[in-house]
């Protein structure tokens, strides 16, 4: 790992530790989603997944933090090992810290539709137990963020990604030493926009547009990646006598092309088109 990435990681951890003791507001949620049309590269079968998520977002004097961890449980067509009758299991964690430059400097950074500008850093970390790859992804991200002036929030960021992996294939017993991909860009947006058509709804989600990352660990080319995940959520809290935004249910759709940088040319599992149902509890 380069000195720049190391310094970024240390600064990130320091910011996280400070912010954790000074949160002005926070929202933690536990959610469940389910779909039967998930896909994985080099697997031509539709995969059913049950996904449990724990997320937390908080704000403090100079910015905000976001942490999320998915626990993904696949059906047996995405097996946990070669010849297994059980499905794969995966944990995927993500953290982002955004430093609001206007709050730091005491001046306005607003222009046009932009209400503020931030500097964001964070990490992705995953571990999956499956038959063919057993991903152990490690990734540092950093870059500028534009915070748009909309109801709710809409943040647009341009990140540099420092990503590595160390896969293991249970079919061959081959372990690949940790491999660092070429530093590559990601244009990303995240949003949560409330609206009302007689019932309280919100449009939420994220979109990632990721550049190629050089050769993969096996010497093959990587492809540009698109991952759009969006949902319409209904706030049913009032109907059950709870506070606003405590209980939400909705429908979700994910379009993920060239998953993990694997081209979908002659590889149908590399692109997923997945409808889901989703339920959330906020506390």
Residue ranges, per PLM feature:
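Residues that define the transmembrane beta-barrel architecture of outer-membrane proteins
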Residues: 48-52, 87-93, 134-140, 181-187, ...
């Amino acid at each position: 790992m380069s000195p720049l990435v190391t310094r970024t990681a240390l600064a990130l951890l320091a910011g996280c530790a400070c912010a954790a003791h000074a949160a002005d507001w926070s929202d933690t949620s536990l959610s469940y989603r389910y779909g039967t049309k998930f896909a994985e590269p080099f697997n031509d079968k539709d995969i059913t997944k049950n996904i449990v998520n724990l997320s937390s977002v908080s704000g403090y004097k100079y910015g905000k933090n976001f942490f999320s961890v998915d626990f993904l449980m696949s059906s047996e067509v995405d097996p946990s090992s070669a010849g297994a009758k059980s499905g794969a299991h995966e944990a995927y964690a993500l953290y982002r810290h955004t430093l609001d430059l206007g709050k730091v400097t005491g001046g306005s950074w607003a222009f046009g539709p932009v209400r503020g500008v931030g500097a964001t850093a964070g990490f992705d970390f995953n571990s999956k137990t499956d038959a063919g790859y057993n991903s152990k992804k490690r990734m540092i991200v950093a870059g500028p963020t534009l915070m748009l002036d909309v109801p709710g929030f809409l943040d647009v960021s341009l990140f540099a990604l420092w990503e590595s992996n160390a896969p293991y294939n249970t079919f061959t017993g081959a372990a690949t030493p940790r491999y660092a991909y070429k530093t590559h860009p990601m244009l990303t947006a995240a949003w949560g926009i409330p609206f009302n058509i007689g019932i309280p709804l919100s449009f939420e989600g994220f979109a990632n547009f990721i550049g190629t990352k050089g050769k993969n660990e096996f010497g093959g080319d990587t492809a540009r990646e698109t991952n759009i995940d969006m949902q319409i959520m209904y706030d049913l809290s009032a109907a059950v006598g709870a506070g606003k935004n405590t209980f939400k249910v909705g429908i979700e759709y994910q379009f993920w092309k060239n998953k993990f940088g694997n081209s979908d040319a002659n590889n149908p599992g590399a692109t997923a088109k997945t409808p889901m149902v989703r339920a959330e509890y906020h506390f």
